[in-house]
């Protein structure tokens, strides 16, 4: 196996953030090439191996090479036998992708086959599913803006990284658990401010809700447990060389208890010289 080169295959849904990712990788020193037909990837890598000094290489593969997708999965398996490689898959939920296409007004790669953008997105998910199954990392960018995605990619692949990039999400179980969560903490056992009439329409960023949640003995104990665990776990992630970690804290609706806890844990992580990305999914 050739350990002199590190290769990142960047793939995923159109509108998922692949362009931002490739540009960020280029900014941190990767040699990047996009939309390379899978049949010539091995030949391309062989040329780089012989004639260039690039150590880090990123290759974009997406639905635009649809006619080669069946070969792409086999190709990746072959590359993994030769090079140190990581497959990064970027995705987002349908509503987010629809909004991004509405904002950019760019045509979807499958728009020539499907007049309905919903159908194009559905078909793309199906076509790319085999690549998704081969991926080493899957990033859901639904709640990330371009700046946050750049920060995440830099933290994952930049030479300067020391600590893992941490994303911390508040959510409501009513709408499901975040698909990309590595650690999940369930706060539904804590007293619920939703049932206090004066607090029902507020959220965890409002001081009355925050004061109510944080004065509970259960909350104090729970926060202590989470902080102690994360202090221990983050040091382990550093030793492991883990690039990023997504922490999710949930309550029933995702508007009160989980929001308060996420803000508290984010402040604690900042005290450890970490810079977490905070997402309140259901606010």
Swiss-Prot record:
InterPro entries from the UniProt entry: P-loop_NTPase, RapZ-like, RapZ-like_N, RapZ_C
Gene Ontology MF annotations: ATP binding; GTP binding; molecular adaptor activity
Assigned keywords, A-Z: ATP-binding, GTP-binding, Nucleotide-binding
Coiled coil feature spans: none
Positions annotated to bind ATP: 12-19
Binding sites annotated in the UniProt record for GTP: 62-65
Entry superkingdom: Bacteria
Xref: Pfam families: PapZ_C, RapZ-like_N
Family: Belongs to the RapZ-like family.
Its biological purpose: Displays ATPase and GTPase activities.
Name by which UniProt lists this protein: Nucleotide-binding protein THEYE_A0235
The organism of origin for this protein: Thermodesulfovibrio yellowstonii (strain ATCC 51303 / DSM 11347 / YP87)
């Amino acid at each position: 196996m050739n350990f002199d080169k590190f290769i990142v295959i960047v793939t995923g849904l159109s509108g998922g953030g692949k362009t931002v990712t490739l540009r960020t990788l280029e900014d941190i020193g990767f040699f990047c090439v996009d939309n390379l037909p899978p049949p010539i990837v091995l030949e391309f890598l062989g040329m780089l191996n012989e004639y260039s000094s690039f150590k880090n290489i990123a290759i974009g593969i997406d639905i635009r090479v649809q006619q080669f997708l069946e070969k792409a999965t086999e190709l990746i398996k072959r590359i993994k036998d030769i090079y140190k490689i990581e497959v990064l898959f970027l995705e987002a939920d349908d509503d987010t992708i629809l909004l991004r296409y509405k904002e950019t007004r760019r045509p979807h790669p499958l728009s020539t086959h499907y007049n309905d953008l919903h159908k194009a997105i559905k078909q793309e998910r199906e076509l790319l599913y085999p690549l998704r199954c081969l991926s080493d990392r899957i990033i859901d960018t639904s709640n990330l803006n371009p700046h946050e995605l750049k920060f995440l990619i830099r933290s994952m692949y930049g030479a300067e990284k020391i600590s893992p990039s941490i994303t911390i999400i508040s959510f409501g179980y009513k709408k499901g658990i975040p698909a990309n969560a590595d650690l999940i903490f369930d706060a539904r056992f804590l007293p619920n401010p939703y049932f206090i009439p004066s607090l029902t329409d507020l959220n965890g960023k409002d001081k009355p809700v925050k004061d109510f949640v944080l004065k509970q003995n259960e909350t104090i104990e729970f926060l202590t447990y989470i902080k102690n665990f994360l202090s221990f776990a983050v040091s382990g992630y550093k030793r492991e060389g883990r690039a990023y970690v997504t922490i999710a804290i949930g309550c029933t609706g995702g508007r009160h208890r989980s929001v308060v806890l996420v803000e508290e844990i984010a402040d604690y992580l900042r005290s450890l010289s970490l810079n977490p990305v905070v997402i309140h999914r259901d606010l």
